[in-house]
Amino acid sequence: MTTDVKDWVPEYLSKFQDDGYAVVDAGLDSGALFELGALLDTEHPGERNLLGVPAIRELARSETIRDLACPVLGDNCFAVRGILFNKTEEANWKVAWHQDCFIAVAARSEIPGWGPWSIKAGVHHVRPTSDVISRMLAVRIHLDDCNADNGALRVVPWSHKYDFLSVSQIQQFPKKSAGTCAAKRGDAILMRPLLLHSSSPAKIPSSRRVVHLEFAADELPTGVEWRHRV
C-alpha cells in the first residue's frame, strides 16, 4: 500500500521503524519524473556514482526528498551514495537474499572492526561496524511501475533489527513473512539497509528504473570520510 508523503506522521513512522520499510508517494510530479528518466537514460545508464551527477545531487538535497529522509534520520541527515538500478530484457538478473552492508568512502584507511574493502566503479567501499549501517536509510525512487512480474523488491519485515548476518544465517532466516514491495511510477520505498531483501528476474521484462539514494546522519570515525556528503 502506498502512503502519501503528507501522511508521514509519527504513527506511521513507528510502523516503519518496526517493519524496516515503507512504500510512500515520493512527491515528485510527472514532469520531474520524465526529466529524471530522460537524463539517466541518455547520459547515465547503469550509473553507480549518481551523486556525482549535478541533477541527482539537486534531487537528493531537495525539500521533496528530504521530507522522506528527515522524519527517519533527523534534519541533519545527508545523502552519501546514489545508484541507478534497472532491469531490462538485456539485464534481467536475480538478486539473492542479502543485507546492504557496505558504504562508499573517499579513501581507504584502516579502522578497527572495518572491512573487507573493495573498489567498485573506481570508488572505495568498506563494510563498517553495524552501528553505522543500522542508522542509515535508503530511499528508492521508482521511475517505472514495478510489481512481481518485473522483478519487484521482496523484503522480510523486522529483519533489520538483527546485526550483520552470515550467508548461512541468511539462508536459514525465516522468510514466511516476506512480502513483495509493489510500487507505482513516482513511489519511493524507504528501507533500512540491514533489512533482508531480494528480487527475482522479471517474468515480463520491461524497464524497471530505480534511483537508489542512501542517507546518513553521522560523521565517520577520524581517518575516513564519506565519498559524498550532499
Where are these regions (language model features)?
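Hydrophobic beta-strand signal
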Residues: 23, 188-190, 212
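Non-heme Fe(II) oxygenase catalytic core, chiefly the N-lobe of the double-stranded beta-helix
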Residues: 2-19, 28-185, 198, 202-206, ...
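Charged, cofactor-coupling segments
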Residues: 222-230
